[in-house]
From Swiss-Prot:
It comes from Cryptococcus neoformans var. neoformans serotype D (strain JEC21 / ATCC MYA-565). One of its GO terms (molecular function) is dol-P-Man:Man(5)GlcNAc(2)-PP-Dol alpha-1,3-mannosyltransferase activity. It is found in: Endoplasmic reticulum membrane. This is Dol-P-Man:Man(5)GlcNAc(2)-PP-Dol alpha-1,3-mannosyltransferase. Keywords: Endoplasmic reticulum, Glycosyltransferase, Membrane, Transferase, Transmembrane, Transmembrane helix. Dol-P-Man:Man(5)GlcNAc(2)-PP-Dol alpha-1,3-mannosyltransferase that operates in the biosynthetic pathway of dolichol-linked oligosaccharides, the glycan precursors employed in protein asparagine (N)-glycosylation. The assembly of dolichol-linked oligosaccharides begins on the cytosolic side of the endoplasmic reticulum membrane and finishes in its lumen. The sequential addition of sugars to dolichol pyrophosphate produces dolichol-linked oligosaccharides containing fourteen sugars, including two GlcNAcs, nine mannoses and three glucoses. The keyword Zinc does not apply. One of its GO terms (cellular component) is endoplasmic reticulum. Pathway: Protein modification; protein glycosylation. The gene is ALG3.
C-alpha cells in the first residue's frame, strides 16, 4: 500500500469537516431558519460584554445630575414647565421623560449611586437589540417580492463603543425613546386595526420621551394613508395627539392658567432652540457664525422638506402606478386602505420609517454624540436595502466611515465632513438603488 493511500481517508475526513464547518457558518449567518440561533448567540455575547463595561468602565457624569435636579423641582411642586431646570439648563424634553426619571429618583436607593440605574439601562439595551432583531426578522418575511434580511446584519449592532457608552455609561433618555419607537414598528409590522392603533399609542409614548421621534412622522403619515386610508390616518393622528395632551395633564390642570399649556409645549417641543457649536458632530467644518445663522437653518429645512417630498413622490409607493394611483385610491375610498398589502413587501414599513429618519439626520441642524442612538440600529437594514448602493464593499465602507465619525471625540473638520458625506451617500443610495417600483407587466407576471 502506498504512502499516499494511507493518508487519503484522513484527508477526506478533514475536507469533510472543513466543508461541514463552512456550511454551518454560512447557515448561521444567512439561512433564515437559523436567524434566532445567531441572534441568541449574539445576545449572550452582548450580556457578557455589557456587564464587563458596567463593571470596568466608570459612569460618565453628563446629564444624569441635571435630570435628577429637574425631578427635584417637579416633586417640590413646580408646574410651570418653563421654570424647571438643572445644571445643564432648562428642561427641554416632554413629560414622559420627566415621569420616567422621577421613577428612577423614587426607586433608586440613592441618586448618587447610579449602578442600579446602569443595570436598568442594560435591560433597555438588550431589549432594544431584541426589538430590532424582531423588526429585521419580520421585514424578511418571504412575501410579495420581499427578501430575507440575513442575521449577519445583526453583527454590526454589537460592535459600537459609542452605543454601549450611550446606554450603559451616560444614561441618556434617547435610548428609552428609541426602544419604545421600535416596539411601535413591530406593532405596525404585525398589522391589523389593533396593530396600527397600538403602534400609534407606542409612537406617541416614544414622542413623549423625546421629540426626535418626529423625524419618523413623515414616513408614518405615508404608511397610515397607505395601510389605513384617510379615516384611519385621522384616527391614528388623533391617538398620537390625544396622548400628547394627556401626558402633561398634571401641568395643565394643577392651576387654571392657560399660560401653563403654552409653557409646556414651547419648552418640550422647542423647534427654535439653538445648539452649542462646541458639541456638534456633523457641522464642525463650518464656522460658528454660519452654524448659528438663521439662513443655514432655513436652507436645511427647505432641503429636508424637498428630499422628503421626492421620497414620498417616487420611492414610498412601490406599486404599479406609484404615488398618484395610491392617492386616487385613498381619496376615492377614504374608509379603506389606499393600497393592497399584497402589493408591497414585508420590509416596506420599516424601510419607509427608517429612511424618513435618515433624511432628518442628514439635514439636522446639529447632531450630538447621544443622537447616534437615533439610527445606529437601523444602519445595517438601510445599507442592505439600497443605502449601500447595492454593493457589499460600499456598504462596509459607509458603515465604517459613519462609525469612525461617531467614535471620534471631539469631532474634527474631517470627521464631520465624513459623517455628512456618509449620510448623503446613504440617502442617494436609497433613492437610486432602493426599493424598485414594479411595472404593471411585472405585477401581472407575478400573478
Amino acid at each position: 500500500m502506498s504512502r499516499q493511500s494511507l493518508f487519503t481517508p484522513a484527508l477526506g475526513q478533514r475536507k469533510g469537516l472543513i466543508s461541514h464547518t463552512v456550511d454551518l457558518v454560512r447557515a448561521l449567518l444567512f439561512d433564515r431558519r437559523y436567524f434566532w440561533h445567531t441572534a441568541f448567540l449574539l445576545f449572550l455575547g452582548e450580556v457578557a460584554l455589557s456587564l464587563l463595561v458596567i463593571w470596568k468602565i466608570p459612569y460618565t457624569k453628563i446629564d444624569w445630575p441635571a435630570y435628577m435636579q429637574q425631578v427635584d423641582m417637579f416633586l417640590a411642586g413646580e408646574r410651570d414647565y418653563s421654570k424647571i431646570e438643572g445644571e445643564t439648563g432648562p428642561l427641554v424634553y416632554p413629560a414622559l421623560h420627566l415621569y420616567i426619571y422621577t421613577a428612577f429618583h423614587r426607586l433608586l436607593p440613592s441618586i448618587e449611586n447610579v449602578r442600579p440605574a446602569q443595570f436598568v439601562f442594560l435591560g433597555f439595551y438588550l431589549a432594544t437589540y431584541l426589538a430590532i432583531s424582531t423588526i429585521y426578522y419580520l421585514a424578511g418575511r418571504p412575501s410579495n417580492g420581499g427578501h430575507h434580511f440575513p442575521q449577519v446584519l445583526l453583527i454590526p449592532l454589537t460592535l459600537s463603543k459609542r452605543a454601549h457608552s450611550i446606554f450603559l455609561l451616560r444614561l441618556f433618555n434617547d435610548p428609552i425613546a428609541m426602544l419604545i419607537f421600535y416596539l411601535s414598528v413591530i406593532a405596525f409590522q404585525i398589522g391589523g386595526r389593533k396593530g396600527w392603533r397600538l403602534g400609534c399609542v407606542l409612537f406617541s409614548l416614544a414622542l413623549g420621551v423625546k421629540m426626535n421621534i418626529l423625524n419618523f412622522l413623515p414616513g408614518l403619515l405615508v404608511l397610515l394613508f397607505q395601510y389605513r386610508g384617510i379615516v384611519g390616518t385621522v384616527e391614528g393622528l388623533s391617538i398620537i395627539g390625544l396622548i400628547q395632551f394627556l401626558l402633561p395633564a398634571p401641568f395643565f390642570f394643577s392651576k387654571s392658567n392657560p399660560y401653563l399649556i403654552r409653557a409646556y409645549f414651547t419648552s418640550a417641543f422647542d423647534f427654535s432652540r439653538q445648539f452649542l457649536y462646541e458639541w456638534t458632530v456633523n457641522w464642525r467644518f463650518i464656522s460658528e457664525e454660519t452654524f448659528l445663522s438663521r439662513e443655514r437653518a432655513v436652507t436645511l429645512l427647505a432641503g429636508h422638506l424637498t428630499v422628503l417630498g421626492l421620497f414620498a413622490a417616487f420611492k414610498w409607493s412601490p406599486v404599479p402606478g406609484g404615488t398618484l394611483r395610491v392617492l386616487r385610491k385613498g381619496f376615492s375610498d377614504p374608509l379603506n386602505q389606499a393600497l393592497e398589502v399584497s402589493q408591497v413587501p414585508a420590509y416596506h414599513i420599516p424601510l419607509v420609517l427608517f429612511s424618513a429618519n435618515l433624511i432628518g439626520m442628514l439635514f439636522a441642524r446639529s447632531l450630538h454624540y447621544q443622537f447616534h442612538s437615533w439610527y445606529f440600529h437601523q444602519l445595517p437594514f438601510l445599507l442592505y436595502s439600497g443605502a449601500g448602493w447595492g454593493n457589499m464593499l460600499t456598504s462596509v465602507l459607509i458603515w465604517v466611515t459613519v462609525q469612525y465619525a461617531w467614535e471620534t471625540a471631539p469631532s474634527t473638520i474631517s470627521t464631520s465632513a465624513a459623517l455628512l458625506a456618509g449620510h448623503g451617500a446613504m440617502v442617494f443610495g436609497l433613492f437610486f438603488h432602493g426599493m424598485k417600483r414594479p411595472s404593471s407587466s411585472q405585477k401581472s407576471k407575478a400573478k
